Amino acid sequence: MSYSRGGTLVTLLLLLVVASSLALTANANSFESLLQLPRRQSRSTRPRSERLLHVGNFGAKGNGVTDDTKAFADAWKTACSSKVKTRILVPENYTCLLRPIDLSGPCKARLTLQISGTIIAPNDPDVWEGLNRRKWLYFHGLSRLTVEGGGTVNGMGQEWWERSCKHNHSNPCRGAPTALTFHKCKNMRVENLNVIDSQQMHIALTSCRRVTISGLKVIAPATSPNTDGIHISVSRGIVIDNTTVSTGDDCISIVKNSTQISISNIICGPGHGISIGSLGKSKSWEEVRDITVDTAIISDTANGVRIKTWQGGSGLVSKIIFRNIKMNNVSNPIIIDQYYCDSRKPCANQTSAISIENISFVHVRGTSASKEAIKISCSDSSPCRNILLQDIDLEPSNGDGFTESFCWEAYGSSSGQVYPPPCLSDDTSFLEQSVQSGITSAYL
């Protein structure tokens, strides 16, 4: 009897425990529904962080011979219409031959073009017959684009260079494609790429905002004409960092109506150096301001850090800093040239000029291949103002003789050791001259 009572008691206790547990579960479910706690999603319903599109799945052969343009365009169209972040992959073992192509937006979500392999252009300029000769890979109207991958973009420019009027003066001067053009793009990154042998310019930013370029190698022969490395126009908020440029023209060029540009940790050369300009051609109005070039090694170039403007233009170049620049066997290491003339015929003298002011050259050291290591040649009608030379040491490349400075209508100051000796007129004399000129003109 006692065993039966004990068993009954145990059974009752078990029933109470089960009932309590069910009640707690019900209460918990009720509480959870009130707070709308997040539930775990199954693998099939959980959104993926990024969609991957392999160009091979769109028909690309990647053998360097078959035309992969349509496959690439189809992949781009799919990626651009995707509502989730998407990555287009050109894998390491692919060489995609692409004809001129527009890769335009706007796209619905973030898009990454990962070039781990190689993209090549047709090597025959006649492919561009009837097309825009200035374009090859043309990115337009995009936001939040990233182009990366460690691979190579090859413009196959040899035949273009041979047909250039700069190589053969009997040929007409005709435009040639830029390898990578980014037009009206914003919040964009271009990083970890090799861009080589472009038909003309390698990378152009036009009307862009907030762009970061880093980890690039831009390479073409020193004899290749007009093959600027990175060309910036009508753009603002541009950062270029940790990049090597070796081409036949400017390593980096900044032209009309560009501002807020930071350039750092650059290896440049051979080529034509780092340039602002040319500006003011055909009497145009142009402005470039708030530019900093900090930490660069420039070697075996036709110029070092340069500002170049045509006579007859108007506008302003202001708030430019060139700092921590190492020169190795560079002609014209420091140059401002307001008489720039890239023409077969001599340029006529003009009475107007772009104003140049608030320009600093700080801690520029190394060797000059030209006797004139500092050349600041400014306009009679619009002299350069507030030029600073600070801690400059530019010795002859051959170790013999000395270097010189040349100044014309250049006003400013120097500080620290400056060699060759500075030739700037002080700003006080400029003001006195301006006042005197005003008094004289008042009596005429």
UniProtKB/Swiss-Prot annotation:
Which chemical reaction does it catalyze? (1,4-alpha-D-galacturonosyl)n+m + H2O = (1,4-alpha-D-galacturonosyl)n + (1,4-alpha-D-galacturonosyl)m
Q: In which tissues is it expressed?
A: Expressed in young, mature and dehiscing anthers. Found in stems, but not in roots or in abscission zone of floral organs.
Query: Where the protein is mainly located, per its record?
Result: secreted
Q: What is this protein called?
A: Probable polygalacturonase At1g80170
Q: Which PANTHER family match?
A: PTHR31375
Q: Which residues form the signal peptide?
A: 1-28
List, alphabetically, the GO terms of the cellular component aspect. Answer: extracellular region
